[in-house]
Design a protein with these regions (language model features):
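Generic beta-sheet signal
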Residues: 1-3, 60, 79-84, 157, ...
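Conserved nucleotide-sugar donor-interacting segment of glycosyltransferase catalytic cores
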Residues: 39-108, 161-162
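A short helix->loop->beta-strand "cap" motif at the edges of active sites that frequently abuts
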Residues: 74-77, 152, 232
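Donor-nucleotide binding loops and adjacent catalytic segments primarily
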Residues: 158-239
Length: 239
């Protein structure tokens, strides 16, 4: 892709999105919506180019609507992958934010549809602008949920030991187990790291993946303070 998510996360919009996610879900959604509008066009251009000769498109949540537009426009198959339970269900143990997490309830299913409306609202402006470029009508919320819950197979990179497989999901939802990168067979830790690991009890790993931060210095101080207060050793990954 001509686009790097890590680079985007280091922009002011990306940092604002990350900062707002911790204490204000509405601000988080607004910032993510703005960011998607800003970055979606080059991603969609790449999608058009990369899928020109493809029989099947595999998408994640952020580009689901754009991938579905390409699938509809050019008569291609579309599969989506997820790492959190996203399809509505009565099963609280398979609902992302269940009102009744330990029960089967219609309220959990309603919560799932509310969550899908939330994501539809975030992505619809960018995706429907793309559909307009393709000469297509906008995708409504009803069409979004029908595509997500009935028309497009979903593959979950989750374990059945982690979530309960709902009995009210359709047969095209698959929980496959967790996915892992292939490990490099020739990688060796540095001597400095080996010495540190052998010098005491197992350390705590602390890191945020590719996520950026408006004030990395203050965040690092918090992590160091937590290690000192707990009397634990740690390894901090810079990302």
């Amino acid at each position: 892709f001509s686009f790097s998510m890590q680079e985007v996360m280091n922009t002011e919009d990306g940092k604002e999105w990350i900062e707002s996610s911790s204490n204000n879900p509405l601000n988080e959604a607004k910032n993510m919506k703005k960011m998607m509008i800003d970055i979606s066009e080059p991603i969609e251009d790449d999608l058009l180019r990369f899928t020109a000769d493809a029989d099947v498109i595999v998408s994640g949540l952020p580009m689901f609507m754009s991938a579905q537009a390409i699938a509809e426009k050019f008569s291609k198959r579309h599969i989506t992958i997820q790492f959190v339970p996203f399809n509505p269900t009565k099963e609280g143990r398979a609902t992302m934010q269940p009102p009744l997490p330990l029960s089967k309830s219609f309220m959990n299913r309603v919560s799932g549809y509310i969550g899908q409306y939330f994501t539809y609202w975030i992505f619809k402006d960018a995706a429907n602008k793309f559909r307009k470029r393709l000469g297509m009508n906008p995708m409504s919320y009803g069409e979004y949920t029908r595509a997500y819950n009935r028309d497009v197979p979903v593959i979950y990179g989750l374990s059945k030991h982690g979530i309960t497989e709902p009995d009210d999901w359709s047969g095209d939802k698959f929980i496959t187990g967790y996915w892992f990168y292939d490990t490099s067979s020739d990688w060796q830790p540095s001597q400095e790291l080996c010495d540190f690991l052998e010098a005491g009890e197992k350390p705590i790993y602390m890191g945020f993946g590719s996520m950026s931060n408006k004030n990395p210095g203050a965040t690092t101080k918090i992590m160091i303070y937590a290690l000192q207060a707990s009397g634990k050793r740690g390894i901090i990954y810079s990302g």
